[in-house]
A protein has these predicted regions:
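Acidic, glycine-rich calcium-binding repeat modules characteristic of RTX/beta-roll
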Residues: 1-68
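Low-complexity acidic/polar repeat-biased segments
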Residues: 62-163
Length: 163
């Protein structure tokens, strides 16, 4: 369990292998910082995108000027946000495409954010490169943000690079 000191706190992750943390005091002033080297088969200039689709939506890299976001924030409430099976089942309509219909075929990784309106889970997603969809075996839970609704998460809550 992690708690901040009030004000703005930074929670640091160097990779997807550190295990799942429970952050008890995450707030709008706080930052999740990742030193992980995300794949870059596409431009990664877009830090975060919000998806309000009931089970995720199709993300079209072509309509995003060739950019693949590092963070996908899913704001529809997911009662099973804390299990990999619950997340992969919930995101049944989400997939990453190059043009709206052609699934990506390269290995990509990203952060997936999903919650139930009260708590939020942060997942590392390492797409196998076969279809651009989220599979249970491709997910690693990084953190649970207790009493934080991801609907209010913005790019200011996420940073990249070393400490």
């Amino acid at each position: 369990d992690l708690t901040g000191n009030g004000g703005s706190d930074t929670y640091f992750y160097s990779d997807f292998l550190e295990g799942a943390d429970t952050i008890r005091t995450f707030s709008a002033a706080d930052t999740l910082k990742f030193a992980y080297n995300f794949t870059n088969n596409y431009s990664r200039n877009v830090t975060i995108t919000t998806d309000s689709g009931a089970n995720g939506s199709v993300f079209n890299i072509g309509l995003s000027s060739g950019n693949l976001p590092i963070v996908f924030n899913f704001t529809a409430n997911n009662s099973n946000h804390s299990s990999s099976g619950g997340v992969s089942n919930f995101l049944s309509n989400f997939r990453v495409t190059t043009d709206g219909s052609t699934n990506i075929s390269t290995v990509e990784d990203a952060l997936l954010v999903t919650g139930n309106g009260s708590n939020t889970s942060i997942w590392g997603w390492q797409n196998s490169g076969t279809n651009g969809t989220v599979e249970q075996t491709e997910l690693v839970r990084l953190a649970t943000l207790n009493s934080y609704d991801n609907d209010s998460m913005t790019a200011a809550n996420v940073a990249f690079g070393g400490l």
